[in-house]
Amino acid sequence: MNASSEDPSAGFKWPVSVERPIAAPAIEVWNAISRPGNLELCHPFCERNPVIAWPGPESRDEVHYLSGWMYERRFRQWIDGTGYDLEIGRKNGSTSFVSWRITPIDTRACTLRITVCPHALQDIPVAIRWIPYTLRLRPLLRDYLESVVKGFEWYVVRGEAVPRNAFGTHPWFSGR
């Protein structure tokens, strides 16, 4: 997929979003999310975040989770000061669409929203899909996103790296 005007989330059903207010100017949150290797400082389940290409819509990096999983992020849209869209997944595997957006509240605060359109369950008929989505996928993905957004808040507000598993462990991404 290219970085054109195509909607990379087209075809995905039932996205999961988390939004959190952060007591910092939008530019400070942008500086955190747009910094190369930012996940090492801000992500409570990230062990390493090596950068392949940065910055802009052709950015690529890897997320090495505490659990041993490794995902590749391929950025598709880069909106200076506002956010970006990307695809994430195992190398040469299926990808999920992810959108990061910062919205100013006033000069001293903003919100950070992360929306994931997960690739998991997309090929299962809707009549069946809603059961694992409602009981397992959505709650675990929401917990994960809450921890990630809290991690960025921690880093921006405190000026220090977020501790690993700072907001609790996660069955997919924490160390085993």
Language model regions located:
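Hydrophobic ligand-binding cavity/cleft-lining segments
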Residues: 1-54, 172-176
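Short beta-strand segments that buttress and anchor functional surface loops
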Residues: 7, 59-66, 85-91
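Short, surface-exposed coil-to-beta transition loops
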Residues: 15-17, 69-73, 94-99
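Beta-strand elements of well-folded, non-transmembrane domains
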Residues: 22-24, 67-69, 118-122
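A short, structured loop/turn motif at beta-sheet edges
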Residues: 23-27, 76-81, 101-111
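Hydrophobic pocket/interface hotspot
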Residues: 29-33, 39, 61, 75, ...
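Beta-strand/loop substructures that line and gate deep hydrophobic ligand-binding cavities in soluble
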Residues: 90-147, 154, 163-165
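Short, highly charged C-terminal tails/helix-capping segments
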Residues: 149-176
